Amino acid sequence: LALPKERVLDFEVTHRLVDGGAEVDYTVTTNGSHDVTVEVLDGTTKVAEASGKTGTLKITNAKLWNVHAAYLYNFVIRITDGHAVIDEYFDKIGIRTFEVKDGHFLLNGKPVYLRGFGKHEDSDIRGRGLDLATVKRDYELMKWIGANCFRTSHYPYAEELYQMADEEGFLIIDEVPAVGFMQSTMNFLAANQGNGKKVGYFEKETTPKLLENHKAALTDMITRDKNHASVIAWSILNEPQCTSEGTEAYFKPLFDLAHELDPQKRPRTYAIV
């Protein structure tokens, strides 16, 4: 893989709806100091542009991204030296807002009811191997049954699934690979037999290293998926032990980190039964 010596490393966007239009705040990260330009295109028609590594793109009569009515704009970043293009990066963005307010999920300021599944990335054809035809079939089946949302149980999926969710207008609760954080009954009894002392899952000597690895996995997921319009929330854990004395001390740094890393400040959650 050949890369320019000076190149685009990352970018992030946030959206605001303003008087029938939209404002897109952006930040571009590069490994150099040359000029950066950003364009938003509706198909091949330029609808907004700005210069600099940070800025705001103003789009009049913006076409919003919505459930089963997805609309994606082309997003182009260029690093230039005079008239010479040093690097060029293309992506697609959907303009939408998502928040929790007064007990409601609001998509573009309007209530939306989440209907769907805790999904798994597998099939009878490829197992967990990526098969785009199978992925497309799954989206069509979910639409047929009336779903609009799924949780990536229990790990981030292949990026192509998020790209297709952006295109199909599906909502994703993106889950970090943190599952099984619970003492089994037999292990709990064996670990505490005869001493009368209860040791919860998050009071073990391995917990600091576990938390370090958990933070790294969470960082990787949010860094990769933060610009997908389909991603509306971060799931921090799946069915963890919640009665351990160390539960809050373990959970809180993760929830705080997710809020810090995400420019769009999506809701944070975890799955529990």
Locate the predicted segments by residue.
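Short Asp/Glu-rich motifs
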Residues: 124, 161-162, 183-185, 244
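Solvent-exposed loop/turn segments at secondary-structure junctions
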Residues: 156-158, 178-180, 238-242
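A general secondary-structure junction signal
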Residues: 235-238, 272
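Catalytic-site neighborhoods of secreted/periplasmic enzymes
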Residues: 181-184, 268-273
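Active-site cleft segment of glycoside hydrolase catalytic domains centered on the general acid/base Glu
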Residues: 201-211, 237-259
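Aromatic- and acidic-residue-enriched carbohydrate-binding clefts of CAZyme catalytic domains
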Residues: 115-120, 128, 175-222, 226, ...
